[in-house]
Amino acid sequence: MALRLRLDKPWRPLTAEVVDRLPGQLGVYQIADAKGTIVYIGQAGARTAFGLRSELQREASQRASGHQFRVEVNQQYRTRWFELLMVHQADHGSLPVDNAKNPPPALGRLSPN
């Protein structure tokens, strides 16, 4: 069985109505623009009041309409966040535009192929 590194769940509209139905669980998420280009990869960690729901409520309130998101519930959210960032960097040669503004320290390299 091959290990799946990429987050391949379907995109959902980043709207308050959709986000308010999310679980209050730990995990990671991706934000994409209307064209499907990933602009941010985030995490909902243990210090987040209501996990993925509160993180994406914040994202929805700060971003223009037309953005979309997908999530993965994951108790190892920090490790998974690093994996997703490294896969994106390997696939595209750089971090997503909004992650590049404040990159994580000491991000390793990953060869997902």
Question: Where do the protein language model's features map onto the residues?
Answer:
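GIY-YIG nuclease catalytic motif and its immediate N-terminal context
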Residues: 1-50, 54, 72-84, 105-113
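Short, compact, well-ordered microdomains
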Residues: 82-94
